[in-house]
């Protein structure tokens, strides 16, 4: 983009828009143990110093654990796990610490053996077992042991990932969790719905989990679904309007951790979302951004939920939708000089910014990812359609003379003037420092994409293509990466 084009009226109007208070990193804590038994124990310590009653399920009996979770909440009891044939050491120790007098075992002897039950009894603890002939029957019997209610949550009894996010809702409202399969309703479920006078149901999962045929047979059903387990969990939080002042985060494939963690979320009257263990899932990012979540408790130690995910949650850019617009494209090459086409430099740097922001937990969106042309208005429209929180326009500079050099960042005063200025002020010094270029400062100009974009917006001029020294840097991957790092770091600093 040529400098003489940029000789536009510079706007030095008073900036009256609100500048957000500087933010700190998000709060991230973690609770976990060396295994599923230890993690459940550590979770219980977040809720109880003593507990007269505890609920115990088999460590691999996920359906039993799901149906038991609302019962545990209602009994003011922790949910603990055990090995099938021997009382787990961690659980045994915890029962003693809590001075527990009564244990409710949920599940039959294949899940928690008679020998294990006897080991619990030997601690001077009274035992009650709730068990049915199958998971449907066990869930129905748990429902009967709970208080009166007219609503139930319905899940596919084999799709465990559908359950954790809805457990806090079911538990705190006293709703039992009942099971069905995709194409039919088990007789035990039908009977308990009738016996308890259930008149409305929340059906969790799409038609791949519970068919419309089953759905239509349930009393006054409402369905919550998602394209995957992460989106489903996010949709549960969104549609049920669960509290998010503290959000519990668990690996979507670590069912024991997720279910036990959900009981903690229920006790604290908060919500739980799911993530991939190695990288914060898109579904989690979206709900974090839309709900402005900033306090997190991770369920499970590494590797269940990696340090990378913890760092993403901590980063204030997490969940923010950042629109990245590499200028020019296709027939519009932009500036040309020293063997460089501006459109190619812009795209290279933009892709690097995209990668870095994605790694930090943001939701970056590129206006183009290849040599494609979009009009300026199309770029503005794309950012609006993406509901972007920020707009980053990336360019390289040029002049008729080869002398001008350096880096500069522009903002416009039409919309979000103060916030745009602040964003530019965070990016510009980092850009000049990283590239070792002349710092030409932060300036105002009515460039189309930043003038007509309604979110905070900046146009970054990385360096001059027409200057030999600047161009030599724009030819090198290491410097293009440094430019991208500066734009990333400035964006993160804006949120701090």
UniProtKB/Swiss-Prot annotation:
Its main location: secreted. This is N-acetylmuramoyl-L-alanine amidase LytC. Sequence repeats lie at residues 30-128, 129-222, 223-318. It comes from Bacillus subtilis (strain 168). Residues 30-318 are annotated as: 3 X tandem repeats. Pfam families: Amidase_3, CW_binding_2. InterPro entries: Bact_Sporulation_Assoc (IPR051922), Cell_wall-bd_2 (IPR007253), MurNAc-LAA_cat (IPR002508). Residues 1-24 form the signal peptide. Belongs to the N-acetylmuramoyl-L-alanine amidase 3 family. Residues 322-490 form the MurNAc-LAA domain. GO terms for molecular function: N-acetylmuramoyl-L-alanine amidase activity. It is found in: Secreted, Cell wall. Induction: Expressed under the control of SigD (major), the transcripts being predominants at the exponential growth phase, and SigA (minor). Repressed by LytR and YvrH. Disruption phenotype: Inactivation of this gene leads to an approximately 90% decrease in the total cell wall hydrolytic activity of stationary-phase cells and extraordinary resistance to cell lysis, even after 6 days of incubation at 37 degrees Celsius. Cells from domesticated laboratory strains lacking this gene show no motility changes on swarm plates; however in combination with an acetylglucosaminidase deletion (lytD, AC P39848) greatly reduced motility is seen. They also show no apparent changes in cell morphology, competence, sporulation, or germination. It comes from the Bacteria. It is an enzyme of class 3 (hydrolase). Its EC number is 3.5.1.28. The gene is lytC. Keywords: Cell wall, Cell wall biogenesis/degradation, Hydrolase, Repeat, Secreted, Signal. One of its GO terms (cellular component) is extracellular region. One of its GO terms (biological process) is peptidoglycan catabolic process. Autolysins are cell wall hydrolases involved in some important biological processes such as cell separation, cell-wall turnover, competence for genetic transformation, formation of the flagella - in particular of its basal body - and sporulation. Has a high affinity for teichoic acid-endowed peptidoglycan. LytC is required for efficient swarming motility but not at the level of cell separation or flagellum biosynthesis. Rather, LytC appears to be important for proper flagellar function. It catalyses: Hydrolyzes the link between N-acetylmuramoyl residues and L-amino acid residues in certain cell-wall glycopeptides.
């Amino acid at each position: 983009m040529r400098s003489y084009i940029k000789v536009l009226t510079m706007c030095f109007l008073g900036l009256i828009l609100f500048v957000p208070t500087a933010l700190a990193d998000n709060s991230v804590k973690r609770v976990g143990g060396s295994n599923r038994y230890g993690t459940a124990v550590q979770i219980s310590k977040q809720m109880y110093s003593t507990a007269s009653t505890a609920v115990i399920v088999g460590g691999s009996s996920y359906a039993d654990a799901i149906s038991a979770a609302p019962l545990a909440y209602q009994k003011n009891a922790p949910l603990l796990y055990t090995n099938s044939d021997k009382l787990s050491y961690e659980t045994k120790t915890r029962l003693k610490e809590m001075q527990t007098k009564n244990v409710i075992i949920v599940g039959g002897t294949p899940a928690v053996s008679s020998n294990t039950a006897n080991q619990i009894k030997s601690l001077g603890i009274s035992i009650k077992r709730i068990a049915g002939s199958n998971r449907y029957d066990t869930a129905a019997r748990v429902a009967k042991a709970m208080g009166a209610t007219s609503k139930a949550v319905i899940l596919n009894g084999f799709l465990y990932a559908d359950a954790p996010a809805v457990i806090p809702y079911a538990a705190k409202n006293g709703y039992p969790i009942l099971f069905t399969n995709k194409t039919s309703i088990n007789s035990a479920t039908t009977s308990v719905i009738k016996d308890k006078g259930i008149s409305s149901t929340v059906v969790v999962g799409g038609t791949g989990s519970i068919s419309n045929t089953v759905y239509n047979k349930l009393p006054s059903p409402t369905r919550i679904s998602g394209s995957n387990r992460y989106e489903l969990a996010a949709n549960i939080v969104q549609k049920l309007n669960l509290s998010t002042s503290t959000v519990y985060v668990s690996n979507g494939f670590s069912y024991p951790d997720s279910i036990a963690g959900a009981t903690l979320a229920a006790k604290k009257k908060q919500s739980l979302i799911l993530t991939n263990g190695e990288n914060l899932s898109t579904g989690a990012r979206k709900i974090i951004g839309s709900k402005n979540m900033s306090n997190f408790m991770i369920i499970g130690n590494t590797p269940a939920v990696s340090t990378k995910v913890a760092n993403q949650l901590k980063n204030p850019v997490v969940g923010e939708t950042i629109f990245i617009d590499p200028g020019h494209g296709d027939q519009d090459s932009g500036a040309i000089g020293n063997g460089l086409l501006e459109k190619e430099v812009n795209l290279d740097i933009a892709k690097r910014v995209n990668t870095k922001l994605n790694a930090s937990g943001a939701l970056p969106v590129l206006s183009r990812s290849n040599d494609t042309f979009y009009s300026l208005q199309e770029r503005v429209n794309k950012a609006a359609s993406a509901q972007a929180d920020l707009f980053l326009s990336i360019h390289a500079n040029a002049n008729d003379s080869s002398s001008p050099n350096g880096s500069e960042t522009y903002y416009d005063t039409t919309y979000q003037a103060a916030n745009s200025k602040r964003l530019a002020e965070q990016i510009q010094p980092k850009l000049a420092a990283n590239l070792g270029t002349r710092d030409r400062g932060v300036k105002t100009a009515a460039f189309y994409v930043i003038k007509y974009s309604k979110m905070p917006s900046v146009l970054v001029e990385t360096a001059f293509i027409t200057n030999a020294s600047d161009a030599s840097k724009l030819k090198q991957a290491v410097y293009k990466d440094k430019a991208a790092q500066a734009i990333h770091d400035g964006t993160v600093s804006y949120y701090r």
